[in-house]
Amino acid sequence: MNTLIIPILASNVNVGPSLHAVGLPSSNAITGFGHAALRVIKDMTGANPSDQGSALVINKYTLLPGRQKPQKASKGDMDKVKKGDLDASLSDERLAVIEGWVVVRFGIGLSGLTSIQDKLSEIWEQLHRLAFAGGVLSIPSKLILLEGDEDGSEAFKK
């Protein structure tokens, strides 16, 4: 089992409370990001890594000052906002900056692992094309590849 650590800096992430996610990228988004990273690896190396799961490790979470915006629930509310009516429904828009890592666990053969090691900097460049919905994603530093990290514990020591 191997681990790829992808440092991330996500800004303008919508962290308003909702029924689906409260303040953090959903588990589907994290899993999707890890899966997309493995697709990039497959496309660049020809290797076929087996996805063993992904996790988001948050190192720093900065909540930005919020602003009120009109709710998009009904046309009547939008008309009230345009007229300056104080009875218009408003909601708080909350944005944040999230710093941390996406930890991607995968299995792969020795030749595939060698291909990944050889192209790690090119893979890093390609990962900049991925994104979280509703925010701006950057990968501020180089990727870390941990070979033989059987239980994933080495990833969390970094």
What is the predicted function of each stretch?
Residues N2-A73:
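N-terminal ordered "arm"
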Residues V22, S26, K82-G84, D92, ...:
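Aromatic-enriched hydrophobic runs in primary sequence
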Residues K42, K60, K69-K75, K80-K83, ...:
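Context-gated lysine
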Residues D43, D51, D77-D79, D85-D87, ...:
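Acidic-enriched, low-complexity/disordered segments with a strong bias for Aspartate over Glutamate
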Residues L63-F106:
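A broadly used, surface-exposed interaction patch
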Residues I98-K158:
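Internal, well-folded beta-alpha domain core
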